[in-house]
UniProtKB/Swiss-Prot annotation:
Binds 1 Fe(2+) ion per subunit. GO terms for cellular component: cytoplasm. One of its GO terms (biological process) is tRNA threonylcarbamoyladenosine modification. This is tRNA N6-adenosine threonylcarbamoyltransferase. It is found in: Cytoplasm. It comes from Prochlorococcus marinus (strain MIT 9515). It catalyses: L-threonylcarbamoyladenylate + adenosine(37) in tRNA = N(6)-L-threonylcarbamoyladenosine(37) in tRNA + AMP + H(+). Signal peptide: none annotated. Keywords: Acyltransferase, Cytoplasm, Iron, Metal-binding, Transferase, tRNA processing. It is an enzyme of class 2 (transferase).
């Protein structure tokens, strides 16, 4: 049984987890997540410097709690992993330095993990997770991407957002409507009271230089602006803003765009399994719509467990365990951190010469 200690500090969650893999059965022994939502809510979003300082404060306690809850000592751990890209640089540095220091102290192999690969790997904790090739919709606060997963974790990005990610749009529209941070859960809750067909909001597309539109790419900035203009118009008329109806209409359109382009991509590439991961994957409207529409095309949908949709270290550990299956995937202790790295370059994190 392979056991990994994993650390996630890419944004505003300080998380440490102990996970294992035995005969392709992935198990979580502990997954401690210390959220900073209350620290950032008064600002309406994550403040990078504040987040990094909070990680420094919390990491010793979260690490101790994760090991204690797992009942696995650090000496019994086979490898240590941390998120090294993408994310907020100051935040990434806290987790990376902690992990590499532990590796040096206890003579353990180090694996630097791509944050998005962590999200992709959250599905490994589900029963009957699909075998490649399959299509993954990764939809979170910072990323909206369609990724084809091949054998040995070869990844091909087929679609992406050109401006705001879906989760970012939820946060900005939530702030516009005067809702609490983060916007995703707040919009989902108040949308239950609204009429999702009340407002006809736009489904924005990205123009293709060759003509027409990019079939699998996303744009949510225009949708966000459309909500702003709608609110301004209602205010000018002196009417009360129907927040539940706007929230429900916005949630519906975002879900429709994600579902329509995901299924189109899966059909075009002849992929009969779709995986949905990331923070926005917790949205109930999106989950139900994806299952319903995919079923019409005989496509099976695999949803990340609700408790693993948002940032956590267990998913980072799962990515590390998957990499360890192929023996050669170990990172140099000289590997640094980077705010950006395309998902299809994740394999470079295990090269003899680190990419950063």
């Amino acid at each position: 049984m392979l056991k990994v200690l994993a650390i996630e500090t890419s944004c505003d969650e300080t998380s440490v987890s102990v996970v294992s893999n035995s005969n392709d059965i992935y198990k979580i022994h502990s997954n401690i997540v210390a959220s900073q939502i209350e620290d950032h809510s008064k600002w309406g979003g994550v403040v990078p410097e504040l987040a990094a300082r909070k990680h420094l404060e919390l990491i010793p306690f979260v690490l101790e709690e994760a090991l204690e809850e797992s009942k696995i000592s650090i000496e019994e751990i086979d490898a240590i992993a941390s998120t090294v890209t993408p994310g907020l640089v100051g935040c990434l540095r806290v987790g990376s330095i902690t992990a590499r220091s532990l590796c040096t102290l206890y003579s353990k192999p180090f694996l630097g993990i791509h944050h998005l690969e962590g999200h992709l790997s959250s599905i490994l904790f589900s029963k009957n997770y699909p075998k490649p090739p399959f299509l993954t919709l990764l939809v979170s606060g910072g990323h909206t991407e369609l990724i084809k997963i091949g054998e040995r974790r070869i990844m091909q990005r087929l679609g992406r957002s050109y401006d705001d990610a879906a989760g970012e749009a939820f946060d900005k529209v939530g702030r516009l409507l005067g809702l609490s941070y983060p916007g995703g859960p707040a919009i989902a809750e108040i949308a239950k009271k609204g009429n999702s067909l009340k407002f006809n909001l736009p489904k924005c597309k990205i123009s293709d230089k060759k003509g027409g539109f990019l079939k699998y790419d996303f744009s949510f900035s225009g949708l966000k602006t459309a909500v702003l203009r709608l609110v301004e118009k209602i205010r000018l008329n002196g009417d009360e803003i129907p927040i539940p109806d706007i929230a429900a209409s916005f949630e519906r359109v975002v879900s429709e765009v994600l579902v329509e382009r995901t299924i189109k991509c899966a059909v075009d590439y002849d992929l009969d399994n779709v995986v949905v991961v990331g923070g926005v994957a917790a949205n109930d409207t999106l989950r139900k719509m994806m299952i319903s529409e995919a079923g019409k095309k005989s496509i099976k949908v695999h949803l990340a467990p609700l408790n693993l949709c948002t940032d956590n270290a267990a998913m980072i550990g799962a990515a590390a365990l998957f990499r360890l299956k192929f023996k050669a995937h170990e990172s140099s202790l000289e590997l640094g951190i980077s705010g950006r790295l395309p998902i299809d370059q994740a394999n470079t994190l295990y090269a003899n010469k680190p990419p950063f």
